[in-house]
Amino acid sequence: MYAYGPVPSRRLGRSLGVSPIPPKTCSYNCIYCQLGQTGRVQVRRESFYPKEDILSDIGKAVKVINSANIDYITFVGDGEPTLCKDLGWLIGKCKQQWQIPVAVITNGSLLFMKDVRQDLESSDVVLPTLDAGSEDVFRTLNRPHGSIGFEEMLQGQVDFRKEYSGKIWLEVMLVKDVNDSDKSLMEINDAIKQVKPDRIYISVPIRPPAKPGVRPPEPGRIIRAHEIFGTILDLTDYESGEFGFDNYPDARTAITEICSRHPLREEQARDIELRFSESGNIDSMLSDGSLVRVEYQNMPYLLPAKFIGILSK
């Protein structure tokens, strides 16, 4: 299943997610990633799956869910979606077939490639990440593919801003003692000024991260980021809203599919059971080992068992 949700998004409302790449295929190996360590760190773009199959799956989801209940079709992936070299074709087909805005959530690392920038030009909103303002923080926090340097990544985002007529909503992930000092925040702000996004979002780790010990900054550091960055939108709390379930036959499938791409708080998973008027799925999945309960910031999360190995590396 390439299309999933809709999931409640703090930025995009009811977002129908589309993953055109294999799990954990990315150009980064971020220490805060909720999907664990990157299995394939690469910059080579590929056709990972038949593009017609991906489009067909999106069409089935839109038909079942009803386009009126979808705010965005969002290419997000279980890694970096711009690694899919069919992304431009898929965006174009979505725009032709459905009157639903298209968003792309990207780490922004491949925007130095002209073909990537061209693939994104027909989307409505692009949401890149910019977590660092220097090479050393970039290497520590995002752990990019060896061929990607900070200046190259930043210049790609600057060039994209010059060429792109849609909206750019930039996200900055702040991690305690990594990029939340005054020096780091001011360096990030200098980079933001070059990109000139339409919106700036601050976020912090709220789900179990790839690297043990990753924590959100102290509240005072988040306030300081607000002071330095100026007008920003805050994503430092949990998302609200309901997941969409019309695309799933039962609670177990819904929990498995959503959890694989969007780790669930246990209360969210229990709510999914209630929506299907089912019970016992979660306890059964915990017993048979297909799900694992993980505590992060005093909040219980349910993750697929396959995550545990890559979260503990």
Language-model features: where?
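Auxiliary Fe-S-binding modules of radical SAM enzymes
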Residues: 1-11, 66, 180-313
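Canonical Radical SAM [4Fe-4S] cluster-binding loop centered on the CxxxCxxC motif
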Residues: 10-53
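Short, basic/glycine-rich phosphate-binding loops at helix/coil junctions
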Residues: 34-38, 69-72, 133-137, 168-169
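Conserved alpha-helical substructure of the radical SAM core
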Residues: 37-75
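Short, histidine-centered active-site or binding-site loop motifs used for metal coordination
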Residues: 37-39, 74-77, 172-174, 204-206
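Alpha-helical elements of Rossmann-like donor-binding domains used by nucleotide-donor carbohydrate transfer enzymes
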Residues: 57-60, 89, 187, 284
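Glycine-rich beta-strand-to-loop/alpha-helix junction loops that act as flexible
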Residues: 74-80, 107-108
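Conserved AdoMet/S-adenosylmethionine-binding subsite of the radical SAM
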Residues: 83-224
